[in-house]
Amino acid sequence: MAELDIQISIEDIGWPGEETLLVFCERVLGAAAIYLRDNEKQPFPKMPPEVSLVFTDDASIQDINAEWRGKDKPTNVLSFPAFPVQRGKVPGPMLGDIIIARETVEREAQELEKSFDDHLTHLLVHGFLHLLGYDHMNNAEAETMEGLETRILAQLGLSDPYEGQDLKMEP
């Protein structure tokens, strides 16, 4: 497994305990880092880079989404890179923060007829890619990012989360 220094903060009592989340996130993000290193030639720093994960609720993520993106509504995941990074370049020692809202993950998982864990896995991978400079602001970026997500999730035994859907460009 690729080494990452994962820091976890739990702000909502509905999330599993810290140890459970840490093991889960180490497996998911470790697999993502290995896939990117081995298949996409993504370099990583010599020291394990730090990723901060905040597991929160809809109200908190709505406040953050309104402040930083001008969207006064909850969202599933937000990512904040610690430093500007270009895809394929060595990131800094701190990758940044990924914030995930439990109620939105639960609601979307139910709507998508997926398990909570499978949807959370997808959102962790999605947020991790944002920390490494990937985005989905246009068709080309969305195609690249969604393709990576699909291949990483396949390594984890999960199906294509975008199958039968249009590209998810950010408005």
UniProtKB/Swiss-Prot annotation:
Keyword Nuclease: yes
Residues given in the record as Zn(2+) binding sites: 126, 130, 136
Cofactor: Zn(2+)
GO MF annotation list: metalloendopeptidase activity; RNA endonuclease activity; zinc ion binding
UniProt cross-references to Gene3D superfamilies, sorted A to Z: Metalloproteases ('zincins'), catalytic domain
Keyword list, A-Z: Cytoplasm, Endonuclease, Hydrolase, Metal-binding, Nuclease, Ribosome biogenesis, rRNA processing, Zinc
Stored Pfam families: YbeY
UniProt-annotated location(s): Cytoplasm
Manner of cofactor binding, per the entry note: Binds 1 zinc ion.
Annotated EC: 3.1.-.-
Single Gene Ontology BP annotation: rRNA processing
PROSITE patterns recorded: UPF0054
Main localisation: cytoplasm
GO cellular component: cytoplasm
Keyword RNA-binding among UniProt keywords: no
UniProt function note: Single strand-specific metallo-endoribonuclease involved in late-stage 70S ribosome quality control and in maturation of the 3' terminus of the 16S rRNA.
PANTHER family linked: ENDORIBONUCLEASE YBEY, CHLOROPLASTIC
Family: Belongs to the endoribonuclease YbeY family.
Name of the molecule in the record: Endoribonuclease YbeY
Species whose genome carries this gene: Rhizobium etli (strain ATCC 51251 / DSM 11541 / JCM 21823 / NBRC 15573 / CFN 42)
